[in-house]
């Protein structure tokens, strides 16, 4: 059985403490994965039938279970902290206290208002104090929180806060550019607009030169 790691528990607890956790129920945590997939597929079957789709059709008959598996194992896998990435934190023995920036992190999420895709990129930076982290883990943490029904504002703050607590520093900054298909494909149908959110703390917030380096350094 996969257990929730210490780092995953730290992440979850700090988000709960700060009121930044997603609105996740606890009642269904004991449902096994396969049972959850089947239950979701049953409801999807009903939804598709109410849309007058013929579920006997060769192309559609397996769609409910395909969507269900996609929800549980892929696009909403970030709802389960057992899927939180394994984190490699190291003592900053080399005394590196300059800015570390990871650019163009691919994020694919889902709008929690319409259950339609949000996709874009994040740039994340930190200035180490006592701890440093494997670079790919920054990407994986960001992608973990993206794999939930989300709003971009919450996602931005979640990533920042979790990195702060794991890295034991306030010096973290993040900016996210995303395209919302709830804007592109419905409602206003604006295919050219995008949404930008940012969150800065520590030296990124208090020091103008560091802030400008984060936003403008290539």
From Swiss-Prot:
It comes from the Bacteria. Toroid-shaped homodecamer, composed of two pentamers of five dimers. GO terms for cellular component: cytoplasm. Belongs to the GTP cyclohydrolase I family. Zn(2+) binds at residues 111, 114, 182. SUPFAM superfamilies: Tetrahydrobiopterin biosynthesis enzymes-like. Its EC number is 3.5.4.16. It catalyses: GTP + H2O = 7,8-dihydroneopterin 3'-triphosphate + formate + H(+). Keywords: GTP-binding, Hydrolase, Metal-binding, Nucleotide-binding, One-carbon metabolism, Zinc. Pathway: Cofactor biosynthesis; 7,8-dihydroneopterin triphosphate biosynthesis; 7,8-dihydroneopterin triphosphate from GTP: step 1/1. GO terms for biological process: one-carbon metabolic process; tetrahydrobiopterin biosynthetic process; tetrahydrofolate biosynthetic process. This is GTP cyclohydrolase 1. GO terms for molecular function: GTP binding; GTP cyclohydrolase I activity; zinc ion binding. The gene is folE.
């Amino acid at each position: 059985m996969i257990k929730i790691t210490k780092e995953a528990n730290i992440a979850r607890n700090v988000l709960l403490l700060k009121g930044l956790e997603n609105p996740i129920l606890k009642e269904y945590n004991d449902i096994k994965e396969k049972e959850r997939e089947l239950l979701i597929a049953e409801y999807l079957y009903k939804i598709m039938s109410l849309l007058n789709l013929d579920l006997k059709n060769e192309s559609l008959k397996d769609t409910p279970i395909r969507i269900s598996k996609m929800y549980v194992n892929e696009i909403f896998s970030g709802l389960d902290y057992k899927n939180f990435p394994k984190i490699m934190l190291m003592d900053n023995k080399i005394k590196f206290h300059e800015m570390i920036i990871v650019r163009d992190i691919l994020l694919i999420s889902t709008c929690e208002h319409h259950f339609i895709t949000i996709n874009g990129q994040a740039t994340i930076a930190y200035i180490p104090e006592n701890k440093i982290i494997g670079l790919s883990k920054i990407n994986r943490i960001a992608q973990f929180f993206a794999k939930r029904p989300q709003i971009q504002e919450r996602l931005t703050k979640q990533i920042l806060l979790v990195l702060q607590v794991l890295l034991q520093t306030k010096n973290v900054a993040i900016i996210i550019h995303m395209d919302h298909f709830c804007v592109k494909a419905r409602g206003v149908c604006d295919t050219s607009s995008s949404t930008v959110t940012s969150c800065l703390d520590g030296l990124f917030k208090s020091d103008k030169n560091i802030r400008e380096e984060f936003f403008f350094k290539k």
